[in-house]
């Protein structure tokens, strides 16, 4: 569960290291975001010569949460850290590589690019 002020790791090579959630998109007064939800983030830490810099406000999709996701068979997939992939205005990933595993819940029409770039799909 990601809410406002939550700090997330960045799971791509866009140049950002950590981001902070400033808004959960998708409805007024929506409080929490889970895996596959789009949030508005600000870059808190970035590497030199990256595609984004500190202070940039971009969209991101949540790919890993400590809360995890419950499957239809009753199993739960949890991760050690919260992580997101940064998106441009067309909802496409800014980076060209994805680090770490992602879940099968991202397998929708708009996030197939992330699924194909990910090294492991759980």
Swiss-Prot record:
GO biological process, one term: translation
Keywords: Ribonucleoprotein, Ribosomal protein, RNA-binding, rRNA-binding
Pfam families: Ribosomal_L14 (PF00238)
Domain of life: Bacteria
GO cellular component terms, semicolon-separated: cytosolic large ribosomal subunit
A GO molecular function held by the record: large ribosomal subunit rRNA binding
SMART domains linked: Ribosomal_L14 (SM01374)
NCBIfam families: rplN_bact (TIGR01067)
Homology family: Belongs to the universal ribosomal protein uL14 family.
Function: Binds to 23S rRNA. Forms part of two intersubunit bridges in the 70S ribosome.
Record's subunit section: Part of the 50S ribosomal subunit. Forms a cluster with proteins L3 and L19. In the 70S ribosome, L14 and L19 interact and together make contacts with the 16S rRNA in bridges B5 and B8.
Listed name of the protein: Large ribosomal subunit protein uL14
């Amino acid at each position: 569960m990601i809410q406002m002020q939550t700090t997330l790791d960045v799971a791509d090579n866009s140049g950002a290291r950590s981001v902070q959630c400033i808004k959960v998109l998708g409805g007024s007064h929506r409080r929490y975001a889970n895996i596959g939800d789009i949030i508005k983030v600000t870059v808190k830490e970035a590497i030199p010569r990256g595609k984004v810099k500190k202070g940039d406000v971009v969209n991101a999709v949540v790919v890993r949460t400590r809360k995890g996701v419950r499957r239809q068979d009753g199993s739960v997939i949890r991760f050690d850290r919260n992580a997101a992939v940064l998106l441009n205005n067309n909802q496409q990933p800014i980076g060209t590589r994805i680090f770490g595993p992602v879940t099968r819940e991202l397998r929708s029409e708009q996030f197939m690019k992330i699924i194909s770039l990910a090294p492991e799909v759980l």
